[in-house]
UniProtKB/Swiss-Prot annotation:
Family label: Belongs to the UPF0416 family.
Top-level taxonomic group: Bacteria
Protein name: UPF0416 protein RBE_0909
């Protein structure tokens, strides 16, 4: 009876460890999907921004972006700026984002808040999955420990002479 109760408790403990590991795996999948969604949105916005900058840069370099032909000196100056936008769109977008953050306290506040939330979600993700991995390992170790007989319980006298 005592052995049966011990085995039932062990089985229940192993199942609990595996259930926790399974839940952590589900959470891992959900967070990975969420991260992929955010990555897709950011990539799509980046491509649209790059296309807009290239289109604008092309119009400005010809001097017709504002609906009239500019004088040569002004056209050269604007073409130089447009060339910088065209050839270094990431740096220019980073400059515009930085300027938007610096000119608006609300933008700065939201940027810091979003960065903190991203860090919080990353920490939560690591914590949950570390716990899940630990629970899975504990479940396997518990299963092996409870079901593998001790060396003293295994008969080794007839190992070579099988009959």
């Amino acid at each position: 009876m005592l052995k049966s109760l011990k085995q039932h408790t062990t089985t229940s403990l192993v199942l609990q460890h595996f259930a926790n590991a399974g839940q952590a795996a589900v959470n891992c999948g959900m967070y990975a999907g969420l991260a992929a969604t955010y990555g897709g949105k950011a990539m799509f916005q980046g491509v649209l921004g790059l296309c807009a900058y290239k289109e604008f840069a092309g119009e400005v370099m010809t001097g017709h972006a504002f609906g009239f032909a500019m004088p040569k000196v002004l056209s050269g100056l604007v073409a130089g700026v447009a060339g910088a936008i065209y050839h270094h769109p990431t740096a220019v977008m980073a400059t515009f984002v930085t300027a938007a953050i610096l000119t608006s306290p609300e933008n700065a506040y939201e940027t810091v808040k979003n960065a903190a939330f991203t860090g919080l979600e990353a920490a939560h993700f690591v914590y949950e999955n570390t716990a899940g991995i630990a629970n899975g390992v504990a479940g396997i170790c518990n299963l092996v420990y409870e079901n593998l007989p001790s060396h003293s319980e295994v008969s080794t006298s007839n190992i070579c002479n099988r009959r």
